[in-house]
Swiss-Prot record:
InterPro entries: Ala_racemase, Ala_racemase/Decarboxylase_C, Ala_racemase_C, Ala_racemase_N, PLP-binding_barrel
Enzyme type, top EC level: isomerase
Entries under Gene3D superfamilies matching the protein: Alanine racemase (3.20.20.10), Lyase, Ornithine Decarboxylase, Chain A, domain 1 (2.40.37.10)
Name this protein carries in UniProt: Alanine racemase
EC code(s) of this entry: 5.1.1.1
Gene encoding the protein: alr
Residues at which substrate binds: R130, M292
GO molecular function (one): alanine racemase activity
Catalytic activity line of the entry: L-alanine = D-alanine
Gene Ontology cellular component list: cytosol
Its biological purpose: Catalyzes the interconversion of L-alanine and D-alanine. May also act on other amino acids.
Keyword Isomerase: yes
HAMAP family recorded: Ala_racemase (MF_01201)
Amino acid sequence: MATATLTIDLDAIAANWRALDQMTASDCQTGAVVKADSYGLGAAKVAHALARAGARRFFVATCEEGADVRRALGSGPQICVFSGHMEGDTALIRDFDLTPMLNSIDQLTRHFEALGGQPFGLQLDSGMNRLGLEPGEWEAVAGFALEAGPELLMSHLACSDDPDHPMNAEQLGAFRAMTDGTGVPRSLSATGGILLGPAWHFELTRPGIGLYGGRPFEEARPVVRLSLPVIQVREVEIGEPVGYSNTWTAEHTSTIATVAAGYADGLPRTLSSRATLYAGRVPCPLVGRVSMDLITVDVSHLPEVPETLDILGPHQTPDDLADTAGTIGYEILTSLGRRYQRRYGALAA
């Protein structure tokens, strides 16, 4: 079979959620971010696993994502939408019982006119300058917005992956200035904010990348293994090139495995002649270009060529691969291609 297998450990995702939940006080709820199809790992199955672990509030990017999660979970859990109430979203918000995080005066107006009485939250800009009501706007509308009974006041940290960055304290101060005394539950922290400490926790946290084994949650359990099938093996003589543009040439007689995955499957082209794959615990260098469907790997040092080679797993996390590619683990996870056969179960040692 020429299809790679992406193994996803739902028990590990649930364990990571529980570990992050235990970092906060008992009166602080821990939500779960399942946007972008749970970072590419399958929102329906991931949301089910997190609900079984105890999560009761889920966050998505769009109403369409929210509808998919609601179909998977049924009634009960709250599903919050970061993009708020966009034009054309009214029917989805109503029909799938979604809670938009309203982020502008226009959205406030749209929501109150179209769905007065429907739950909502408010997103405030504490300094990231991306989404949310700015302090001046909030001051102007806080009275009637609070009177309408928001479920949540939230903001987002720009630099929480760097605990020493002064922006963390600046945003904390700005958020408190806008929300102290409102009596409304508040949320400022994703994974990085949880790790900053209790001052950033408020009444709700909403971890994302930490659930899926990523930084900055260094104690997270690994969640994915990506095993790529070897299609063909050939001997390459000294001086012979491999792959497009002849970017790699054999300096000695080499055994080269052609492996079924490429940039169409989410492997960045910047991994060319830089990445490492694994045969069990043994590293094997990627040689030559990453092409659309194929990569080539030097397996000269293996006593026997295996049927598959791992590019993600216990010996190489998405963050490790991202470091090699010059990107971030989020991009590696969310780019994992549709051609992979997804299998849910424990990761083999």
